[in-house]
Amino acid sequence: MLALWPFKARNGNGRETEVEASFPVGDPCPDFLCVGAQKGGTSWLYRQLEAHSDFWMPPLKELHYLDQLNRTKRFHAPRCRDQCDGFFLEGMKGLSSRSYLDLESYGRLFQHKAARVSGDISPAYSTLNDEIIERVVNHFPKMKVIFLARDPVERAWSQLSMGVRLGMISRFDATDPEEVVCNLLNPGVLVRSHPSKTVARWKRYVRPENFRVYFFDDLKEKPVELRRSILQFLGGDPDQPSGELKPHENNDASREKLRLTARVRDRMAQFFEQELKACAAELGGRAKSWPSRYGFSLLLFFWDLLDDSIDLLFWCDWIC
């Protein structure tokens, strides 16, 4: 199918004129969402998919439409290498001027993919509430959803390092455990530090066959296998290369981070103890080993859950 779109071009006098351009279009919907986690490998994923011939990715990595209606500060100018990119960016401008969630127009942004696979990689979607998630999933029932999970201690430290580097978080004494905890209580950090809740929220509405959790641990240790698994799930050919980009290439890994001392690491682990155990139970997979990294017993966690369940049963029996 061909679509006609108005496009502004410059004539010989340097003035903008509106012309029509035609190009093949695909279904008006994103094929997938990547809903996090921030500092979980989402930039790596975007670069792998953007350079792959089976995918057409938006000209900017994080659209933020579902969480901020696109009203967000960007640190990098978006790509605009052809008319499809131009049309996409014009469409985003139109969406950002509206004060309501227009999922139909949002879906049409992805028509530029033609027969390829396309999606929205916005880690901030990990913070969406149940109402928005339900609306989005009901509107795009076939859409796949993936979540790149990372050990909460490591993820939070990486976010703090990025925040200081970009000037979003004031510099603090990174060797003082209690000062670090104060920064962990920053709403922008705390809301992104409970992957067990994020995954549980999305799983309530997404069909099991359309939802997958992947792990940052595998990006560090088995990037080839991780890339293959994600591409197969999304519908791409894992045997096709992502241009000249290798699976192990992760630019973010080389960026400067705050030095994490053993004392601060232990204090952060105490802060996230319950979340580490909740991740092991909710996410499974590589998350099962997270509590033991910090000397926590998962057996005691499940015993406490069982004890709470027994107490609840006795309480219900007493009420009846």
Where is each model-derived feature located?
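Surface-exposed cleft-lining segments at the edges of enzyme active sites
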Residues: 92-93, 120-125, 178-191, 217, ...
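ATP-dependent NMP and nucleoside kinases share a basic, alpha-helical "lid"
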Residues: 127-147
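Active-site periphery "cap/insert" segments of enzyme catalytic domains
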Residues: 124-134, 191-199
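Short N-terminal helix/helix-N-cap motif within the alpha/beta-hydrolase-1
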Residues: 127-131, 157, 224
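The conserved 3'-phosphoadenosine-5'-phosphosulfate
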Residues: 60-61, 68, 142, 150, ...
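PAPS-dependent sulfotransferase catalytic domain
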Residues: 98-111, 163-229, 233, 237, ...
